[in-house]
Amino acid sequence: MGGCTSKPSSSVKPNPYAPKDAVLQNDDSTPAHPGKSPVRSSPAVKASPFFPFYTPSPARHRRNKSRDGGGGESKSVTSTPLRQLARAFHPPSPARHIRDVLRRRKEKKEAALPAARQQKEEEEREEVGLDKRFGFSKELQSRIELGEEIGRGHFGYTCSAKFKKGELKDQEVAVKVIPKSKMTSAISIEDVRREVKILRALSGHQNLVQFYDAFEDNANVYIVMELCGGGELLDRILARGGKYSEDDAKAVLIQILNVVAFCHLQGVVHRDLKPENFLYTSKEENSMLKVIDFGLSDFVRPDERLNDIVGSAYYVAPEVLHRSYTTEADVWSIGVIAYILLCGSRPFWARTESGIFRAVLKADPSFDEPPWPSLSFEAKDFVKRLLYKDPRKRMTASQALMHPWIAGYKKIDIPFDILIFKQIKAYLRSSSLRKAALMALSKTLTTDELLYLKAQFAHLAPNKNGLITLDSIRLALATNATEAMKESRIPDFLALLNGLQYKGMDFEEFCAASISVHQHESLDCWEQSIRHAYELFEMNGNRVIVIEELASELGVGSSIPVHTILNDWIRHTDGKLSFLGFVKLLHGVSTRQSLAKTR
Ligand SMILES: Nc1ncnc2c1ncn2[C@@H]1O[C@H](COP(=O)(O)OP(=O)(O)OP(=O)(O)O)[C@@H](O)[C@H]1O
Ligand SMILES: [Ca+2]
Ligand SMILES: [Ca+2]
Ligand SMILES: [Ca+2]
Ligand SMILES: [Ca+2]
């Protein structure tokens, strides 16, 4: 088998931004940190009635509608996941979380090994001692009246319900019931704890399901939230035969991007964005969309990279498979949703999950088949920029809302972008030479880029002299903050911007600080703009530099082979940076950054 389960073939380029050990794991590899990886309920997996979602089962390519209507687990069917959404779709959420698939395979292989069997027995013994107390209220009975089942997932089912008393008396709500019997490892318990913690911490966004309370008894955990009676986005896509007009797709994507930008600013990465996990509040055509199911979500610090492989196969980003990722992985999933909305087909499709992973890693989605040729250039450009395999080139959720395809449709308040912090931090740690190079490059920003930066600058509340300072940033964050920010250590990260404590930053310098070289590089005008930037740099910034200094600038040792390479980056005639050196210097710090990130 290929994809995630075998070594990448030689045509797969090694991931330049991934840590050295972050290549695709092969079948019998163990996760880097078994204790931390979100292995989800392995014994439950075996007992689960779901088939692996990829099982080819040509006879059953119809979606089982009754499943939604509260059918038991046995009603879940496996369908052949065709590329065309219009004809068939795998049952909602049968896509096992990827880790489960990998793990089951591993277990199958290892079952024969006595050592593995012994380990399994140990794990089972461990289960007996698991502490399944969450510290949630035990008062469900007196507070909530449970109604009928309205939805079902891998981990539990959801019922409609009503508050019996209190402020919310008679309010209809939804209760997700997660049986404790399914929590068979410390990790699966931790997952539920985190799901509630994240829901509790994130609040106040109109496209995020409102959390009310969590309860528990001996049998279950109960998550009480706002009732979304309009069904899953997936069902609407299917009902339309999988095709949305551009404007209808925009209306959906704006809501998705808005709430995801919000989550990212709070330091939460969802990790399971797909049409099943967006619900409409009511049956009305233009009712509001809400993101649900934070069961795979995690907090992520601005300078942290995650390494556990979770998500659903069709929506998983390449860097997740490479085990080094952060918030950009969610944006990829939105790209997959956007592609599906616009054409009704999946961008990365295969009959097996390893085939899907291979496609995600290597294949470029097709924009040649109908209806793509009849769609606007902007629509295609938008989707492509969400599906860049290099996450550094990919738009952020906030940037995507500024993309001409969206911006031309509706005036939107652009959410504050967490990327800006990361960029400013890297800038403040750069040498004066690199700052000068960035300043030169920032003179070539396009109108769209400038609009985006203006919006971001405004978020940081510049003072009356037009300067942003650490205090203004702090204030700006405080107005956007939820409890989640503490968990993702955003305030700690701010301390790294202390370079702004006494010296403010004007818009001009902000542009130099915030420009993302990798994103700028992906523009059509890159070639021209980098040449122009070098001319500006020559007039105002270039200076004599020695190899040792350059090596330290780039965060590489100055060993002999490095010396040979760097030699080309310095102009022999006058000892200043050559064009090549200029380009490398601009990219340089991100190399150092990503090295630092993998520590
Ligand atoms: N707030 C809600 N209002 C209405 N229905 C809901 C709500 N939350 C969940 N549901 C329904 O219950 C289903 C399962 O919920 P959820 O996706 O959170 O469970 P899960 O067990 O984590 O699922 P998965 O298998 O996708 O991981 C949803 O797909 C949806 O149909
Ligand atoms: Ca579901
Ligand atoms: Ca779900
Ligand atoms: Ca889930
Ligand atoms: Ca974490």
Swiss-Prot record:
Keyword set includes Calcium: yes
Protein kinase domain boundaries: 144-406
Regulation: Activated by calcium and calmodulin. Autophosphorylation may play an important role in the regulation of the kinase activity.
Major location (coarse): membrane
UniProt-annotated binding residues for ATP: I150, G151, R152, G153, H154, F155, G156, Y157, T158, K176
Positions of the UniProt region annotated as Autoinhibitory domain: 411-441
Name the UniProt record assigns to this protein: CDPK-related kinase 2
Organism whose genome encodes this protein: Arabidopsis thaliana
Lineage: Eukaryota, Viridiplantae, Streptophyta, Embryophyta, Tracheophyta
